[in-house]
Curated annotation (Swiss-Prot):
The keyword Transmembrane applies. The gene is PRRG1. This is Transmembrane gamma-carboxyglutamic acid protein 1. Residues 21-80 are extracellular. Keywords: Disulfide bond, Membrane, Transmembrane, Transmembrane helix.
Amino acid sequence: MGRIFLTGEKANSVLKRYPRANGLFEEIRQGNIERECKEEVCTFEEAREAFENNEKTKEFWNTYTKAQQGESNRGSDWFQFYLTFPLIFGLFIILLVIFLIWRCFLRNKTRRQTVTESHIPFPQHLNIITTPPPPDEVFDNSGLSPGFLEYVVGRSDSVSTRLSNCDPPPTYEEATGQMNLRRSETEPHLDPPPEYEDIINSNSASAIAMVPVATTIK
């Protein structure tokens, strides 16, 4: 028999319980089968080994199974909440980040548009329509009449439109207004040419009028 069964000391030396990671807490608060079965999932055999009595084991097992069923029912009610709440919270954070990024992008875009609009120069070929001045203010501070200013503006507009239409630039005569004078000078005379006798008479008269000059050589 001694070879088949071990004594108590030898059995405890072989079959012993190793301490857990919270061994210090277990030394302060000694555990029991009820607390261990509530904290962990235990079986009927483990409870019978702990109580070593069938009546106490059955009584404990009935209360333990009822408590486990109640806790499982309460846990199933909260399971959906524990599952959906993190998803809803994460989706809200993602939407908030997307909204902030879109807001910053829109603000930067509006700032760029305002800066570019402020730097765009005013086109020079556009005319500004203003009300006519009163008759007292016929001349401005520079001494130029409004008619002269309108003439200058109209000429600049014609030149700008000609340049925009890819026409060649105006000549010097067109720019200075001397085109009509040059045309009048180049036009042929309408008088008939002089006759041959008139040319001879004019040449003879000029020869008689000339006085000879005598030179002396010493």
